[in-house]
Amino acid sequence: MAEINLFEKYSYEEVKVNNVSLRPYINLSRRGIVPHAATTITKGTTGKARIPIAERFVCSLMRHGRNSGKKRLAINIFEDACFIIHSMTKKNPLQVLVDAIVNSGPREDTARIGRAGSMRRTSVDVSPLKRISIAISNLSAGIRNASFRNRITLAEAIANELIAASTNSQNSYAVNKKKEIERIAQSNR
């Protein structure tokens, strides 16, 4: 049987998740040529963990306003972004996506604790599934901010943000947001 590759170009076999705690939640086992599962795999408490990571990222691009619900458009834009990433870095775009998610997920956050009418914030650890969700949300927010009312295309914005986040660069919106969240959590210890 032939190997299934993303967009018939990028192999799932080469992708490694370097963070041990995130490895069970970054799903690379459900392989598809196109990041569209169209199944009921999201049932249960940890249903998001069974969705392929490329599809979760594509679905996050569809949110908020003009592009909501246009999954085919989001898949085509992600395919163009994968081509740009591969031509700029000579790396597998799936590996760049996984590294960007690992680097932009905060490890600590703050929670509000209230007793007797008084509220205070305290530092808490973030679960791996929540860490991935925050990372994907921050990546897509940075991409939206970079391409809104700008000459840069959405595919170029995706490529720039993912490359910057995968190298842990300060140019990435998601990495800066992660550092801000962790700094606030550290001050509330």
UniProtKB/Swiss-Prot annotation:
Listed Pfam families: Ribosomal_S7
InterPro entries: Ribosomal_uS7, Ribosomal_uS7_dom, Ribosomal_uS7_dom_sf, Ribosomal_uS7_euk/arc
SUPFAM superfamilies listed in its UniProt record: Ribosomal protein S7
One CC-aspect GO term: small ribosomal subunit
Biological process, per Gene Ontology: translation
The entry's keywords: Cytoplasm, Ribonucleoprotein, Ribosomal protein
Compartments reported by the entry: Cytoplasm
GO molecular function list: structural constituent of ribosome
Residues annotated as signal peptide: none
PANTHER family: RIBOSOMAL PROTEIN S7
Record-stated family: Belongs to the universal ribosomal protein uS7 family.
Record's subunit section: Component of the small ribosomal subunit.
Protein name listed in UniProt: Small ribosomal subunit protein uS7
Species this chain originates from: Encephalitozoon cuniculi (strain GB-M1)
